[in-house]
Amino acid sequence: MSLLKMEYNLYAELKKMTCGQPLSLFNEDGDFVEVEPGSSFKFLIPKGFYASPSVKTSLVFETLTTTDNKITSINPTNAPKLYPLQRKVVSEVVSNMRKMIESKRPLYITLHLACGFGKTITTCYLMATHGRKTVICVPNKMLIHQWKTQVEAVGLEHKISIDGVSSLLKELKTQSPDVLIVVSRHLTNDAFCKYINKHYDLFILDESHTYNLMNNTAVTRFLAYYPPMMCYFLTATPRPSNRIYCNSIINIAKLSDLKKTIYAVDSFFEPYSTDNIRHMIKRLDGPSNKYHIYTEKLLSVDEPRNQLILNTLVEEFKSGTINRILVITKLREHMVFFYKRLLDFFGSEVVFIGDAQNRRTPDMVKSIKELNRFIFVSTLFYSGTGLDIPSLDSLFICSAVINNMQIEQLLGRVCRETELLDRTVYVFPSTSIKEIKYMIGNFVQRIISLSVDKLGFKQKSYRKHQESDPTSVCTTSSREERVLNRIFNSQNR
């Protein structure tokens, strides 16, 4: 730990990483506060900040020669086979770490690798290469399985803990496995933090973008007060301010053969309203809609739009154009709505729900990986990051209000490399609720723009559904005809 006065150059360097957002750190009294320029307080500067050679410092950091927490179960013959780009990442990491050791810098590296790159297997290779006892920290238990699979493939002795940290501490008194796979809430326990700081050298923070380290969280406190000897942040969408805690980044672009298409399924709707909708519209401009809660609630009860989504999905799935579908909503009630309606169409052998409130959901996710055809309905919170179903070939985004980081993570669910190359995303920019019409259009356009500009998708207009089902409740032509007749009649009165 380094308690330092906030001199101008140090403040400027730290503030630059927050991209204009408030800079918050622990002060000498242990309070997590916003740092003001010229402050007389001393602040705890994160160890990982000094990982970059561009940060000037006279501080000298420990190297791996000062510890003896080595893996005992390692077998070099079990090292996973890597693709050329993955081997390039390993080479870059090893080269950077040599330089860090020579200059006595902290061994902290952010692996900024695209969704579908294979961060888990690459990191397991690095873990085996280092041969140091490791803690793998995940934001939720849904990510445990993919780590368990890869750690077992490498042949490392491991322990998984997702529930009580107290019972884990008791077990650690008699055995100390080479690899601990835990959920991040374990870091709220100071005794556990002290234990892993002493007995484990490598700390892997998976999906690091899910943590805002400018907030006083368990992960923030751990990295500040119990900094590990070595640390990897893994992410496809780095959070800029988190660089203060891990200030060395390796980013290798991944070329892909995937054929990625995003369809904007547009339609003309007559205005739709109910008492419930009118009640929620009144809240759109109030403080209760600060995070667009009511915007998404309105979408969840937009019957014509929901019907368009269902019609499109049912027709595409029946035609065999798409086979392994992820349907994403923002709200749980919206998820349940689509699940029930799709269940009526296709039955429980095809339609599954990714419900955070169901403890059996992770087991269900494992089981559907082997299916050739399925529809998985879930929420952005539960399945938007880290969902491990590599075979997904299509994504229906039913919500609209999604930030750029969430968009990139969500689209990454269908960008995993498999033998099948076609990937399709469907977005729905239209709404029958006129008060949010332009807002929804703008939000959905942001999804389209990011997918095209950054992730290599090609945008195409979607007309198949409207042309193939002229009797549908969502048909464009019939609605346009009625409105045009109405306008014509009004002009000739």
Curated annotation (Swiss-Prot):
SMART domains: DEXDc. It comes from the Viruses. Its EC number is 3.6.4.-. The keyword Transport does not apply. ATP binds at L113, A114, C115, G116, F117, G118, K119, T120. Its main location: virion. Keywords: ATP-binding, DNA-binding, Helicase, Hydrolase, Late protein, Nucleotide-binding, Transcription, Virion. It is found in: Virion. Gene3D superfamilies: P-loop containing nucleotide triphosphate hydrolases. Coiled coil: none annotated. Residues 100-256 form the Helicase ATP-binding domain. One of its GO terms (cellular component) is virion component. Interacts with G2. Might be part of a transcription complex composed at least of G2, A18, and H5. Belongs to the helicase family. Poxviruses subfamily. DNA helicase which seems to act as a postreplicative transcription termination factor. Involved in ATP-dependent release of nascent RNA. Forms a stable complex with single-stranded DNA, and to a lesser extent RNA. This is Transcript termination protein A18. It comes from Vaccinia virus (strain Ankara).
